[in-house]
């Protein structure tokens, strides 16, 4: 096979000649290779001009009339913790490899698509999701695309732009002054005072943060597609970018729009998740049965062994949360989501089905899940065989518990926040990139502080998968809402400890003195086991979260009980677990400068690493 790596580097031109260069590429180059379509040259040059020379690379396969176009998508805008949760390398671009007909380009067969990161060899699930999305996008575009159609649209567009000067100047203007998109993920700021505080530089930062932007035209009368955009996708990340710079730029723009919001869509059907409190951090499958079957068939849920090996303490916690929710008297309300698990003996049926809940069967399978401590002490395959003998649904249930978690949880080194007096400390991030971007914008305007949120261990199975929701006046509410609707927080640990221990029928709020007497016993009660034990030893668990909250006028402070009605203004940061009533100091106040300094020290090394 004749394979030649051909990279095209042509000099740019200005003024009146810019149109011909942009639309047709450099004709001298095409004269030597008549089989290479000039529109392909033009589209490649457009990528180089709008992005950079390094954003595209080409390899020709002359004897079979094929060409591979590698488009490099910069994902450095993702936070370090987000990229870790998604298992991508933010320092390395994602490569979209499209194979076209060299001589026919858009008139030829639909291009094949590969999505990869050169250094990311295993577990690149995000690439599978993006490949599926871009495949569907290309199939839709290919129904009306042709070289002549694209050339005609670009010529019309260029004629319209001539009065405004060169194309480069126009693009520069677009890159600076393009409006903030009207997107469900990034709503337009309506508050007039807020608009006043946001100057032009701040708007530019906001536009860069909100990378799920679609390319929308300021003048809606100018139609560059030849057909109106679908109303179903109008106004969010599924908007079809303009074709004015060619198909290669269009698909790059579409990929850039979709990447920051991949967590908001099902990895199988690409339909938006429906959650009470918006999207979560990790991409996941939706609850549609067809998607569940496809998800299982694709083998995406086969990562249990890796998770147990690399994050055994986290898996231990997830199982404990699932058990607490399943054994709760309120399980019909709080055990949500209910597992969707394919029957290993009959892959066409669901052994556990949210539409046909069977808590007794689920309890039996969960009881057969061996302790994570045991799993780490031997061969995972041998452990799996033992579980299969006990109950064939035990291992599939464990896979579901791991894969359905949509938050990023990492066990911290022992006693990172020493004032919390527990070895079971976790970094807990559940907010998707869109919410974190909105949170940071609000933080710049109003500032933030830290406060505790107490909720019983049985509630966290749902919180990790559905988010920290405003449960006031809903069936999820347990403690009342004396201070109105919102997420309840407190700067005082004793108050949150009280909420965290009230999940089993106790509805009276203990006084602070009672809590101090009951819980502040770290130095008076003999320890029956090492406090530094790696895994949870007991099923009698208490937990609280440490959250970062925006200090805007929306935050209502009623003494030491705070209520935040805006869910976007609360982000979980840390999670602490205590066993057998052994909890920390009940007098911790997050507003104490010493406490704040310690929190910021750990936050600086764990959350804002970039």
From Swiss-Prot:
GO BP, one annotated term: protein auto-ADP-ribosylation
Name of this chain's protein: Protein mono-ADP-ribosyltransferase PARP6
Superkingdom classification of source: Eukaryota
EC code(s) of this entry: 2.4.2.-
Disulfide pattern: none
Protein encoded by which gene: PARP6
UniProt key word Amino-acid biosynthesis: no
Originating species: Pongo abelii (Sumatran orangutan)
PROSITE patterns: PARP_CATALYTIC (PS51059)
